Every structure is written in structure tokens, then in C-alpha cells.
């Protein structure tokens, strides 16, 4: 009986891909990114990790999750630098992708076309529930999109939205639970509605 021996190395050609992990704040996006990158390192693949220089909430260089799990990364000012620093790697990880410029979409495409596995995590919506930065374009070109959810702090259901609890109209405002809360659709609408004031009718 003849047996066909599987070639674990598959082709000699590397197969690139783009994986996007998206969701609201406190949904575990960075945790999932770190999990995938650690598995790649265990498999002895070369990994480079990038984050925007603006993200200094926990550490100036490391990618750090809300649970304080961390992995060393290279902070970069713009997406073009990712291409320059990603030569001869198997996997590229990118955290807080929403803070990058729109050029990140083309950067991810080029890396994947070169045979690199690109794993990206970021907020898909801002606090107004509007598409955030390059995330819509990244989701469009991705080979796989994983939408993760937080838990609504008001009712306990799955949360998809990041509700800002402090004043400010600017789209980018770094913060934690004191500034943002994950909410479901119903609770987001309730918290976004102006408080109802009881109308008082005076009688003469």
C-alpha cells in the first residue's frame, strides 16, 4: 500500500494573509493579538510588532493589554515605517490600528502580497459609533475579520460600542474605564440621550 507523505512545509512560497481583530474598548482585542503572536513565536516564526507612538497609556514601547499582559514592540509615527522595518519577517502584528494613517491599508496589502502574515487589532468605531481611521479599509481587504465584544457595564449584555463619559469632541482621546465604558446598543442610546426634565406648569 502506498502512502502519500504530507509536506509540512507546504510550498516553498510563503502565503501571506491579513487578519483583523476589531471591536469596542475592553473587548479583548489586544489580548487576542498577543495570543496569536505568541503562538507564532512558539512556532519559531520571526515576528515584528508595531504600535502608534501616540499609544503611551501603559508603556512607551511595549504593546500592553488592559490585563497588563505585554510584549515588546516598535512604536512608529506612520504606516510607511512599518514596511521599512518589516524585512525578512514571517508575521507582523499591529495594535491600535485606528490611530494610524490611511496608508496602513496599502502597507498591509503589500506585506501580505510579499508572503507576510499580518495580524491587526483596532477599534472599528469611535465614541460616536463612526468608522475609525483605516479600520474600514483594513476590514475590507482582510482574509479574516474577528469581531470581539466587551460586556455592557449597564446591563451585562454583549457590548459593541465605546461610550465616552468625559467631555470632548476630538476623535482621539486616550483613556480607560474612567473615561470610556463598553455599552450595548440599547444602553448606548439611553446614555447618549439628553436627560429628560420634567416640565413644570405654573398655575395662576
UniProtKB/Swiss-Prot annotation:
Primary residence: cytoplasm
UniProt entry keywords in alphabetical sequence: ATP-binding, Cytoplasm, DNA synthesis, Kinase, Metal-binding, Nucleotide-binding, Transferase, Zinc
Pfam families per the UniProt record, alphabetical: TK
InterPro entries associated with the record: P-loop_NTPase, Thymidine_kinase
Binding locations of ATP: 23-30, 95-98
GO cellular component: cytosol
Entry's localization field: Cytoplasm
Gene Ontology BP term (one): DNA biosynthetic process
Binding site for Zn(2+): 152, 155, 184, 187
Top-level taxon: Bacteria
Keyword Metal-binding carried by entry: yes
Active-site residue list: 96
Reactions listed under catalytic activity: thymidine + ATP = dTMP + ADP + H(+)
Family: Belongs to the thymidine kinase family.
Subunit structure as annotated in this protein's UniProt entry: Homotetramer.
Protein name: Thymidine kinase
Native organism: Porphyromonas gingivalis (strain ATCC 33277 / DSM 20709 / CIP 103683 / JCM 12257 / NCTC 11834 / 2561)
Protein encoded by which gene: tdk
Amino acid at each position: 500500500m502506498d502512502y502519500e507523505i504530507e509536506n509540512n512545509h507546504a510550498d516553498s512560497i510563503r502565503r501571506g494573509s491579513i487578519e483583523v481583530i476589531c471591536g469596542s474598548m475592553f473587548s479583548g482585542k489586544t489580548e487576542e493579538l498577543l495570543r496569536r503572536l505568541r503562538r507564532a513565536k512558539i512556532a519559531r516564526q520571526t515576528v515584528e510588532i508595531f504600535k502608534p507612538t501616540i499609544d503611551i497609556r501603559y508603556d512607551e514601547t511595549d504593546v500592553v493589554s488592559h490585563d497588563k499582559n505585554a510584549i515588546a514592540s516598535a512604536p512608529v509615527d506612520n504606516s510607511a515605517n512599518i514596511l521599512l522595518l518589516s524585512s525578512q519577517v514571517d508575521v507582523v502584528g499591529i495594535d491600535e490600528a485606528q490611530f494610524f494613517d490611511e496608508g496602513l491599508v496599502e502597507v498591509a496589502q503589500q506585506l501580505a502580497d510579499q508572503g507576510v502574515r499580518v495580524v491587526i487589532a483596532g477599534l472599528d468605531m469611535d465614541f460616536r459609533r463612526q468608522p475609525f481611521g483605516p479600520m474600514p479599509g483594513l476590514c475590507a481587504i482582510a482574509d479574516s475579520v474577528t469581531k470581539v465584544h466587551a460586556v455592557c457595564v449597564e446591563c451585562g449584555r454583549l457590548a459593541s460600542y465605546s461610550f465616552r463619559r468625559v467631555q470632548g469632541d476630538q476623535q482621539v482621546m486616550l483613556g480607560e474605564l474612567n473615561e470610556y465604558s463598553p455599552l450595548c446598543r440599547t444602553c448606548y442610546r439611553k446614555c447618549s440621550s439628553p436627560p429628560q426634565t420634567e416640565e413644570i406648569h405654573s398655575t395662576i
